[in-house]
């Protein structure tokens, strides 16, 4: 058997199986003719108010199917596909005090890529003490033969996907959100999770904020995490709500070059960047002298499936 020179992983999310009682936000938005997440936000709010314990086996089944798909494809470090989350970012926020999911606020997101009505920050943000990540991780790890990576949204990305009606102080809001992520991460560490990823796609869109206070937020997220846990930050340039959308407004991949030095100094182990959809100048990799790079080699927003030779050529094996 040939020796594998690279460890493989995925970023996180998978399409939800149709038998789940919740829907992917982008499918719901597409039904309304765009990327408006308001309907799925309201529907999930209603769902959690009356959800049944009998649904649990469906989420376990979905996680097992998604994990096995990855393992069968040769993925070394799978995720649970985020199958329990109606929205990757808002799912975390539902376990925080200070958020209002009933009275939504209209905002324009992602540099104008889309607009919608969002959950609002109405009071000081604090973790409510109930760690969702431990239950979700243990459930997924119990049906996986490989170590499961757990993913969480980063503070800056949460800020750009919610409506601040209280702080009017972006660094302060970022710090408070980072504290909530840190509480989940430390709970994951205690539960035995060895691969923890914080997603900050907004770093690529808001370079000044990322440099000014976003890096500090990431440091706070991973504060107190021991060395035997792999700490990861993911920075993509944005993905559309459906495949083959060539007009979606992505972040400028030059942002990677602008942030590389600061990211390289963070107390993390790995940085995840996309390439298949933006084709970086690969001199970028030389700027990450202290970090392992998770290199996005699959064009996941395209219906065209690459040949194996194309992937090997891209990563120069």
Q: Which residues does each PLM region occupy?
A:
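Domain-level signal for soluble alpha/beta catalytic cores
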Residues: 1-315
């Amino acid at each position: 058997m040939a020796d594998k020179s690279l460890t493989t992983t995925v970023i996180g999310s998978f399409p939800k199986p149709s038998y789940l009682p919740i829907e992917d936000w982008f499918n719901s938005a597409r039904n309304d003719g765009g990327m408006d997440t308001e309907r799925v936000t309201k529907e999930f709010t209603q769902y959690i108010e009356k959800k049944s314990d009998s649904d649990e086996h469906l989420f376990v089944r979905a996680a097992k199917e998604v994990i096995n798909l990855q393992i069968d494809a040769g993925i070394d470090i799978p995720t649970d596909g985020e199958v329990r989350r109606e929205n990757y970012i808002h799912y975390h926020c539902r376990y925080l005090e200070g958020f209002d999911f009933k009275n939504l606020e209209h905002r324009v997101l992602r540099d104008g890529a889309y607009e919608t009505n969002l959950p609002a920050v109405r009071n000081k943000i604090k973790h409510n003490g109930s760690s969702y990540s431990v239950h979700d991780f243990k459930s997924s790890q119990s049906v996986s033969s490989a170590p499961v990576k757990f993913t969480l949204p980063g503070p800056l990305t949460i800020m750009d996907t919610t409506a601040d009606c209280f702080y009017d102080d972006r660094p302060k809001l970022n710090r408070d959100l980072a504290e909530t992520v840190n509480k989940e991460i430390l709970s994951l560490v205690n539960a035995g999770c060895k691969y923890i990823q914080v997603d900050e796609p907004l770093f690529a869109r808001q370079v000044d904020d990322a440099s000014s206070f976003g890096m500090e937020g990431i440091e706070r997220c991973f504060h107190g995490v021991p060395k035997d846990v792999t700490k990861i930050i993911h920075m993509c340039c944005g993905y559309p709500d459906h495949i083959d959308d060539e007009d979606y407004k992505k972040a400028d991949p030059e942002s990677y070059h602008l942030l590389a030095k600061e990211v390289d100094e963070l107390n993390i182990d790995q940085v995840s960047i996309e390439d298949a959809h933006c084709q970086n100048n690969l001199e970028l990799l030389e700027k990450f002298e202290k970090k392992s790079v998770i290199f996005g080699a699959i064009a996941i927003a395209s219906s065209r499936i690459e040949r194996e030779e194309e992937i090997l050529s891209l990563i120069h094996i």
